[in-house]
C-alpha cells in the first residue's frame, strides 16, 4: 500500500507528461483480453476518463474479435483468418455489424457515461466517417474491407466540444455495402487524419518481442527500418503484421509515435503515457 508521500511523488512524476500532452490527441485501439475481463475493462475506462479530465483528447476505436467469435460459434460459423485479418462472408458480416455496433460499442459508451456524459458511439458509417472498399476485390462473397477514405469532420466536431468518440470498425463503400474492417487499420487511419500525438494499440502481448515466447525480450523502442527488418526475419508474424503495418502508415502520416502495449496490465494506458519507462513498444519514424 502506498503512503501519502509516494502518492504525491507519483503525481509529481506524471506532471511533465500531463503538461506535454495537454490539448493533444490520442487514438486508442481497444481490443484483446481487456475487452473480456470486466475488471480490466473498468481500469481502461478509468484511464480514458482520467486522460480526458486532464485535457487530453481521446478517440477510442474498437473491434470485438472475442465477442464476434463467441457469437459465430453460437450460430455454427467457423471463424476464418488470412494474415491476421478476418475473412468475412455475408452471414458473418451481418453478425459482425450487430455485435460491434449494437453490442460492443453501446456497452463501452454506457460504461464511460456512468462517470461522465462524454462518450458518443459511432461506426464508420456515421457521417461517412470511414468509406470502405474491399480488401479482397477478386472475391465476391467476402466483406472484409479496408479504409478507402476518412471524413474526419464529425470526430473533430466531437473532440472540440469535449466529447470522447467511440468508433466501431464497420463502414460502407460508396454503394452502401457494409464491410468489416480491421480495427487497427481504422485506428491508424483516424490517427493519421487527426495528426494525433499518439496511436496506442491495446493487445494481449507486452509489445514487440524478439522471442514471442519470452516477455523479457520486449523491444522498447523501434524505428520503421527496424520494424521492416523484423518482418523480413519473420519475427513479426500473424496478427501482429496488420498492427505494425498500420503503425508504420500512421507514423509516415505525421503521427508522432505509435505504441503496442499489453491491455491486460492494470492501468496500462496511464503507465505508457504518463511515465518515462512505459510498459510496451514505442514505434517512431
From Swiss-Prot:
It is found in: Plastid, Chloroplast. Its EC number is 2.7.2.8. InterPro entries: AceGlu_kinase-like_sf, AcgluKinase_fam, ArgB, Asp/Glu/Uridylate_kinase, Glu/AcGlu_kinase, NAGK-C. Substrate binds at residues 64-65, 86, 180. Keywords: Amino-acid biosynthesis, Arginine biosynthesis, ATP-binding, Chloroplast, Kinase, Nucleotide-binding, Plastid, Transferase. GO terms for molecular function: acetylglutamate kinase activity; ATP binding. The record marks 29, 243 as: Transition state stabilizer. One of its GO terms (cellular component) is chloroplast. The keyword Cell inner membrane does not apply. It holds the Pfam family AA_kinase. Pathway: Amino-acid biosynthesis; L-arginine biosynthesis; N(2)-acetyl-L-ornithine from L-glutamate: step 2/4. GO terms for biological process: arginine biosynthetic process via ornithine; L-arginine biosynthetic process. It catalyses: N-acetyl-L-glutamate + ATP = N-acetyl-L-glutamyl 5-phosphate + ADP. PANTHER family: N-ACETYLGLUTAMATE SYNTHASE, N-ACETYLGLUTAMATE SYNTHASE, MITOCHONDRIAL. Catalyzes the ATP-dependent phosphorylation of N-acetyl-L-glutamate. Belongs to the acetylglutamate kinase family. ArgB subfamily. This is Acetylglutamate kinase. It comes from Gracilaria tenuistipitata var. liui (Red alga). The lineage of its organism: Eukaryota, Rhodophyta, Florideophyceae, Rhodymeniophycidae, Gracilariales.
Amino acid at each position: 500500500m502506498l503512503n501519502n508521500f509516494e502518492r504525491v511523488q507519483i503525481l509529481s512524476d506524471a506532471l511533465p507528461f500531463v503538461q506535454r500532452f495537454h490539448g493533444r490527441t490520442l487514438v486508442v485501439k481497444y481490443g484483446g483480453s481487456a475487452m473480456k475481463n470486466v475488471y480490466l475493462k473498468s481500469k481502461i475506462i478509468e484511464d480514458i476518463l482520467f486522460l480526458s479530465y486532464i485535457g487530453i483528447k481521446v478517440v477510442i476505436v474498437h473491434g470485438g474479435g472475442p465477442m464476434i467469435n463467441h457469437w459465430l460459434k453460437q450460430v455454427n460459423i467457423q471463424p476464418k483468418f488470412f494474415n491476421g485479418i478476418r475473412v468475412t462472408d455475408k452471414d458473418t458480416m451481418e453478425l459482425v455489424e450487430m455485435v460491434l455496433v449494437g453490442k460492443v460499442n453501446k456497452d463501452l459508451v454506457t460504461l464511460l457515461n456512468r462517470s461522465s456524459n462524454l462518450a458518443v458511439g459511432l461506426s464508420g458509417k456515421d457521417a461517412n466517417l470511414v468509406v470502405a472498399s474491399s480488401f479482397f476485390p477478386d472475391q465476391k462473397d467476402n466483406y472484409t474491407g479496408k479504409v478507402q477514405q476518412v471524413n474526419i469532420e464529425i470526430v473533430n466536431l466531437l473532440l472540440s466540444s469535449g466529447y470522447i468518440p467511440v468508433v466501431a470498425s464497420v463502414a460502407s463503400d460508396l454503394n452502401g455495402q457494409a464491410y468489416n474492417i480491421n480495427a487497427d487499420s481504422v485506428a491508424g487511419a483516424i490517427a493519421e487524419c487527426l495528426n494525433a500525438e499518439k496511436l496506442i494499440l491495446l493487445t494481449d502481448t507486452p509489445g514487440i518481442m524478439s522471442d514471442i515466447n519470452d516477455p523479457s525480450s520486449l523491444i522498447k523502442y523501434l524505428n520503421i527500418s527496424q520494424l521492416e527488418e523484423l518482418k523480413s526475419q519473420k519475427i513479426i508474424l500473424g496478427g501482429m503484421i496488420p498492427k505494425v503495418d498500420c503503425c508504420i502508415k500512421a507514423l509516415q502520416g505525421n503521427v508522432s509515435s505509435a505504441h503496442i502495449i499489453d491491455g491486460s496490465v492494470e492501468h496500462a494506458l496511464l503507465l505508457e503515457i504518463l511515465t518515462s519507462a512505459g510498459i510496451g513498444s514505442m514505434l517512431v519514424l
